[in-house]
Regions:
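Glycine-rich loop/linker segments at domain edges
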Residues: 48-53, 57, 118-155, 161, ...
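Short, surface-exposed loop/turn segments at secondary-structure boundaries that line and modulate
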Residues: 34-72, 175, 193-214, 233-248, ...
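Phosphate/diphosphate-binding loops
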Residues: 73, 80-81, 223-272, 484-493
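Beta-strand segments within the central parallel beta-sheet cores of soluble alpha/beta enzyme folds
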Residues: 36, 190-196, 223-233, 260-265, ...
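Flexible, low-hydrophobicity surface segments
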Residues: 1-116, 138, 211
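Stable alpha-helical structural segments in soluble proteins, enriched in small hydrophobic residues
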Residues: 75-79, 85-89, 213-225, 317-321, ...
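Extended active-site and interfacial segments that coordinate phosphate-rich ligands
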Residues: 4, 90-103, 171, 178, ...
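Helix-loop-helix junctions that connect adjacent transmembrane helices in secondary transporters/permeases
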Residues: 107-184, 345-422, 442
Length: 493
């Protein structure tokens, strides 16, 4: 086993004009120092299809001399031990040519890469807003957020001369297999990705990052397994984040509080090379009833690493802005914010013109109000500062709605009934700490009458039947129907 430690850029905008590796190469245990000049060719992926071939930082590592964000990998040291690789990486001298830097936290539509995209539209929101009796027109911002699970991103790559076996911290082994095969330039059947257990990811481990390609290519060049663990400080720079958003929300309403217009115009930053859109209107179109709605989105470039999915991407920052605006409207109407939400509850998804498969928002509001004693609330800002030991600790009581899609995707699974009275269930999905192993053993056990300890669950390996990503809260809902179908077929044989 060899250990790889990247050399990270100390500028955020410019180019590498020289790399002095002489001292590092002479240090004990060092096998190689790789950079643009000697790393070989890696390839970009084709546009993804479904949940296959997705990668947010599309530029292969060391692809050119450009530096577009602080912490970008510009070289990597491979050595016999992690300590030797770290010491050598620290001794590599990189010379840069700097360029103008843009990390500004205020966005304007004039900076947008393209004309804002219309994500959803119905009616004539501009006219309805212009004639509305009451209006809210505010801008809301959410900050950059990083995932930082306790388990660091890491890769162990083993190339045997023809095939790659990649042990990855990934929430999507099948997608990782496809991406790695494309970028390494080998057939997909020559790549096996394994992720048996995962110390969470929060979306940051859904798609492969450059460290995975570096480990795999280094293994190919060295002919030995290579391990690369992303350092904690690099977790803030090179493995994605939820981007800062800036959203203008316009609500128009009658004097009674019925919404006549909803408009949401969102901006988020992306990297200098990639086009990540946060999608802040994910839930806007179906949150409240209105005949007139428009949601647009646009991206602006900044010298940062590529953003990525994080815990309810789009919906979380988008609903923060929408719900804040609903509270502003309640204040101007001088009505209870729960009452405002109840009177604007939609009977169906007005964007799709379809009934909801499930929706319990009204129930949540009413039960929550009863359980929390909402009737005791006073509306004035700062009027509920607490009494006794709680004095001064609160500003008031608030309410906000939230929503997430109940989506499912295709999945495959196998179930084997073994001669020793046990069973095995397999699928190339993952357990990111949410209990997929336990859930599947319980489901199969209930169906065939076995205790869960007599059921082996095998996950996280692309040699298994293709399973769903562990993201979007849909892995369990997607894989269980496949497992139940396999159980039925196995018991009928």
């Amino acid at each position: 086993m060899l250990y790889a430690v990247p050399v990270c850029a100390t500028i955020a905008s410019g180019a590498v004009v020289g790399i002095d590796t002489a001292r590092a190469e002479a240090m004990p245990g060092v096998k190689a120092v790789y950079h643009r000049a000697n790393f070989g060719k890696l390839f970009r992926t084709v546009p993804p299809s479904g949940f296959s071939g997705i990668v947010d930082e599309k530029r292969p590592p060391f692809d050119d001399d450009k530096v577009t964000y602080y912490g970008q990998y510009v070289a990597v040291v491979v050595a016999l031990t992690f300590e030797q690789a770290t010491a050598a990486a620290n001794s590599v001298k990189v010379t840069y040519r700097t360029a103008p830097l843009n990390v500004g936290t205020h966005f304007s539509e004039a900076e947008a890469v393209e004309t804002p995209k219309v994500d959803s539209h119905r009616g004539d929101p501009d006219a309805a807003f212009a004639s509305a009796a009451l209006k809210v027109d505010e801008v809301y911002a959410t900050p950059t957020e990083t995932h930082n699970p306790i388990e660091l991103h890491a890769s162990v790559a083993d190339f045997d001369g023809q095939n790659f076996t990649l042990y990855e911290t990934t929430q999507a082994v099948c997608n990782a297999q496809d991406v790695m095969a494309q970028m390494l330039g080998v057939p997909v059947e020559n790549v096996r990705v394994i992720s048996r257990f995962l110390g969470s990811g929060f979306g940051g481990k859904l798609w492969p990052w450059t460290h995975a390609m570096i480990a795999a290519q280094a293994s190919r060049l060295q002919g030995r397994p290579v391990k690369l663990v992303v350092t904690r400080d690099s977790m803030f720079q090179s493995v994605g984040h939820r981007p800062r958003t800036q959203q203008r929300i316009r609500l128009g309403a009658t004097v009674q509080g019925k919404l006549v217009a909803v408009m949401q115009d969102s901006l988020n930053h992306t990297s200098m090379l990639d086009d990540y859109a946060e999608g802040c209107s994910e839930a806007t179109g179906y949150s409240y009833s209105t005949a007139n709605l428009r949601a647009t989105s646009a991206i602006v470039r900044r010298n940062v690493g590529a953003p990525t999915s994080m815990r309810g991407p789009g919906a979380v920052p988008g609903l923060f802005a929408l719900e804040s605006a609903m509270d502003e409207l309640a204040v101007r109407l001088q009505i209870d914010p729960i009452e405002l939400r109840l009177m604007n509850e939609p009977e169906k998804d007005e964007g799709l013109n379809l009934p909801f498969s499930s929706r319990h928002f009204v129930e949540c509001l009413k039960v929550g109000a009863e359980k929390f004693g909402w009737s005791k609330r006073t509306a004035g800002v700062g009027s509920m500062t607490g009494v006794g030991e709680q004095a001064g600790l609160t500003l008031g009581w608030g309410v906000a709605g939230c929503s997430w899609i109940a989506e499912r995707t295709e999945a495959q699974a196998s179930v084997e009934l073994l001669s020793n009275g046990t069973a095995r269930v397999s699928s190339a999905t993952q357990d990111i700490g949410t209990g997929t192993y336990t859930v599947l053993s319980k489901i199969v056990g209930e169906k065939i009458g076995l205790r869960s300890e007599r059921i082996e669950v095998v996950l996280g390996d692309t040699k298994l039947p293709a399973g769903p990503i562990s993201g979007g809260s849909w892995a369990t809902a997607s894989v269980i129907p496949a497992v139940l179908d396999a159980v039925e077929k196995a018991t009928q044989m």
